[in-house]
C-alpha cells in the first residue's frame, strides 16, 4: 500500500507507463537475477572452470536509429557484454575477458520493440497465482467434497482431497492418488514429525493401517510407493539414485516449485512463517494444508473465489523476457560444456571468447518476438490503436486458458475488477471476456497484482487532509470505498449524507462518515477506449463495447477535425501515442518544410525529421504536418507537427457532420446510411492508403534470377513505367496488370522443345541454350495508384538464403463510396447505401442540406441514447463555435444534468444566431426540415445535429471480389474460398432452397455441376459462354459425386450407377 507524496492531487499516468516499467524492471533486476543463476562449468577432469562475473555486465547503445531499423528490416537491439573467467585449477591461473553474449531487443519510446523491421508489442497475461486454493463441489450423491489445490509457479497442480471417512489423499493425476502420509514421508518426514506438526493427529492416526505403516516405514519405501503410483509402474521397482532423480525432475520440480509469489501466498493463507527464499513446497506446507482441509470439512475457514483478482497475478513484459533469458542461458550452458570437452579432446587451449557464442541468446529472443502468442504485431491503424494494444490483458497464452475451455464465470465481470480491469472494453466473439483492457489508473505491483489508486479520508474533517494510496485487490476488501456522487471533481461541493460504497465485494449505501476511501477520478474504472465516449452513462454496455472497439478501426483522414463534444482525454491519448512531434526544450524555429523542422535551443541547432507518407501495417497512411512558422519562439512540450489523426495535439479520428435521424425511401433500412455527394466531392471522408508489394531474387540451380527491363513476349505498354534497371520509377501512376519489377528466372528447356536446326547446332558447337521464364511483380486487381517509394534491400552475403528484396509502395486516394462502413462513438454503425445529389438531400430551415441520414429505429431498441445528446450538443457547439469536454456520469451533480446542459446550449445558440428553429420548446432538439426533391416539409419534426462520425477500415475496395474462373481444390475440384485465394462463391443449402423456390431447375443444375466441379464440362461452359453457343450436357458424374463414391468404397460399400433410358424406364415401371 503506497502513498503519493502530494496530498489530494493526482494526474493521469502515461498510457505507455506499464510497458516502460516492465522493461525497466527486466533490465534493472531480471537481467542480473538470471545471469547470477548461471553456474560454474567444469570439464570432466575438473581441471578447468568457466564462470561469469555478473556485476560487470554492460548493455551497449544501438548503432542504428529506430527509423533506419524499420527501413532496412533490422532489429533495434542492444549488445550484452559480460566479463567471463577461465580458471586452471592446477596452476591457479585465471584468464578474464569481456565477452559478447548476444543481442537483446530494446523498447522504444512507444513501448514497443522493432524486430526485423516490424513493430511488435508484448501484452500482459493474467494467470492463476501460485499458492493454495480451497474449493468444494457436490459429488453424485449431493454431498460436498472439499479439495485444496496447490498451484506451482510453472502451473503444475497437486490436489489434496478429503473423503467421507475423513481420509486425506493427494491426487497426483486424474486417475492416481496416494495417501498424504506417503507423500509426506517421501518428502522426508517420519511419522513422529508428521503427528507433532498437525492440529488433528487423531484423524491422521485413524487411517493409519498396518499396510500404510509398512509403506511409510522408511523414506525409501515411501519413495518407491510414490514412484509406483506417480509413474504407473507395475511390479516391484528397486530404490536407486536415478529413480530419485527422475521423481525430482518429473514431479517435485514441476509441481512443487512455488516461486517467491507462491511462497508469500501460502504463508499468508496457512499462517506460516517460512522464509521467503524457501521457494519449494515443504512437508510443513502439506501438513498445514491438510489441517486447513480438515477444518473446512467441519465448517471452519472460508472457501476461495478463484476468479477474484487477489488470486490472479499479472505476467508482465519483465517476467516473459526474464523467462526467455533463462532459457537462452540454459542453452548457452550446454554450448559451453560441449566446447570445453571438444577443446580438451583436440588438445586446444580454450579462452572465454572461444567458448561463448552469441547465437543462443539472439535466436531465443528473435523466436520469442516472432512466434510467442503474447508477442503480437503492433496494430497501427490510428494513434488510439497503438496505445490500447499495449494495455491489453489476456487470459490466453502459454499456461493460461483457451477460447474453447474457458467457462462463463471466468469471462464475467467480477467486483474485484473495479478500477483495475475495464468492465466494458473486451473483444467480441470467442474471446469475449478473455482479452480485457487495463483501467486508466491501474498499475502492476511488485508481486504481480493489479493496483488501483484511492484517496484516504481522515476521520476528523473528511476533507482537510487527503492522501492517495495504491491498493491491491486483497487490501481494498477491508475498506469502505465510496463511489457514485462522492466522485465530485470539486471537493468544495457538499457531499450528501448517504453515499453508495463498495465493501467486501458488495455494493452498499452508507453514511458519509463511515467512508474510509474514495475514488480519485470519474474515468477510473474505464479503459482508454471507453473513456473517449461522451455521455457513456446513457448507453447500453454492449454498444459501449462496440464503440470502444470501433474507434480502434477508424481510418486517419486526409483532413482531420477535432470533435466538438469530447471527454477531455483526447489530448493525453495523442501525446502518449508518439504521433505528434513535440519540442523537447524551448528555442526558436530557424527553418521548416514538409520534411524537417530546424530550431535552435540551449546553444544547439537541432533538426527534427518528419514522417512522410509512412505505411502502417494496416495500410493506413502515417504523415506529419508542421504546425509552427519560421521565426516563432517555442516552449518545451509544444506541438511542432501534427501526426495522422491528430489536430493541435488532440486525437481527431473522424468529422463533425450534419446528420438527420429520419427514414428516407427505405435507403436507411437495417442500419444502412444515406449520404450527400458533398462528402465525396469535398474530400470530407477521403483517406490515403499505402500498399506494399515485394519480390525476392533467389539463386536457383540454373543460375541467379535477374532484375531487368528486357522482358520478352510482354507488351511495351505494361513495361512503360520501368527504369533502365527494371524497377518502377518513383512518382509514376500504375494500373492493374502493370509490371512493377521486371524479373527473369533461368530455366533449361526440354530437348523436345527445340527446333531440329537448334539441336544440330548444339550438337556441333556444344552450346547450352538457356531460356528464361518471366516472374515479374505485377500490380494485382484493385492496386492502382501512385508509386511513392521503392526500396531495394540487399542482405549481406547475397546467398539464396539471404535473397535481395525489392519493395514497392503505392499510395491510393480513397473517397467514401457505397459499401464503406461508417460509425459514431456509441456503437451506431452502418454501411453507405446510396450517395444522393446535394439538391435531393433534406435541408434545414436556413437552407443547409444535411450530410448524412441515419435510421431513427436504430436508437430505442439498442438503448444507446448518448448519440442523441452528442448530436444536439454538437449542433449547439458548431453554431456557438465552442468545444465541449464532458466527464462521464455528470448526473452525480444533479438529476438530468446531461439534458439540462444540452437544452441550455441549444437555447443559447438559437438566441445568439437568431434562429428560433434551433430550439423549439414544443419539441426541443428537433426541427422541421424539408424534402430536397419537392421542397415540402416532412410530416414530423426530426432530430438534427452534428455528431462525430468515423470512417472505418472495413472498406468496400478491400472486400469486393469477382471471379470468372480460378483455382480449384484438389480433392473436391470445387472453387477455393476467399478473396485472397481468388476464390468463388459457394452455393450452399439455403441458396439451393431459394433457387428451388423459384423452380429454376436448369440454372440450379448448372450451378451445382457444370460451373462447379465437373472438370470437363466447366471448360466447355466457359468456351460456349464466350462464343454464345448452347451449353453441352455431359453424360458422366461431377467430381463431388465421384468423391462420395470413393469415400463409400473406403467403407467397403460399392455403388454402381448406370443410365436408364426413358423407354426402358416406362417398361420396367409397368412390370413393377
Curated annotation (Swiss-Prot):
The EC number(s) this enzyme carries: 2.7.7.6
Compartments in which it is found: Plastid, Chloroplast
Database matches in InterPro entries: DNA-dir_RNA_pol_bsu_ext_1_sf, DNA-dir_RNA_pol_su2, DNA-dir_RNAP_su2_dom, DNA-dir_RNAP_su2_hyb_sf, RNA_pol_bsu_bac, RNA_pol_bsu_CS, RNA_pol_Rpb2_2, RNA_pol_Rpb2_2_sf
Record GO cellular component, one term: DNA-directed RNA polymerase complex
Protein's UniProt keywords contain Ligase: no
Catalytic activity: RNA(n) + a ribonucleoside 5'-triphosphate = RNA(n+1) + diphosphate
Principal subcellular localization: plastid
PROSITE patterns referenced in this protein's UniProt entry, alphabetically: RNA_POL_BETA
GO molecular function, a single term: DNA-directed RNA polymerase activity
Superkingdom of origin organism: Eukaryota
One GO term of the biological process aspect: DNA-templated transcription
Enzyme class: transferase
Transmembrane helix recorded as keyword: no
Keywords: Chloroplast, DNA-directed RNA polymerase, Nucleotidyltransferase, Plastid, Transcription, Transferase
CDD domains: RNA_pol_B_RPB2 (cd00653)
Subunit structure: In plastids the minimal PEP RNA polymerase catalytic core is composed of four subunits: alpha, beta, beta', and beta''. When a (nuclear-encoded) sigma factor is associated with the core the holoenzyme is formed, which can initiate transcription.
Role noted for this protein: DNA-dependent RNA polymerase catalyzes the transcription of DNA into RNA using the four ribonucleoside triphosphates as substrates.
HAMAP family the record matches: RNApol_bact_RpoB
Protein family: Belongs to the RNA polymerase beta chain family.
NCBIfam families tied to this protein: PRK00405.1
Name the record gives this protein: DNA-directed RNA polymerase subunit beta
Classification lineage: Eukaryota, Viridiplantae, Streptophyta, Embryophyta, Tracheophyta
Gene, per the UniProt record: rpoB
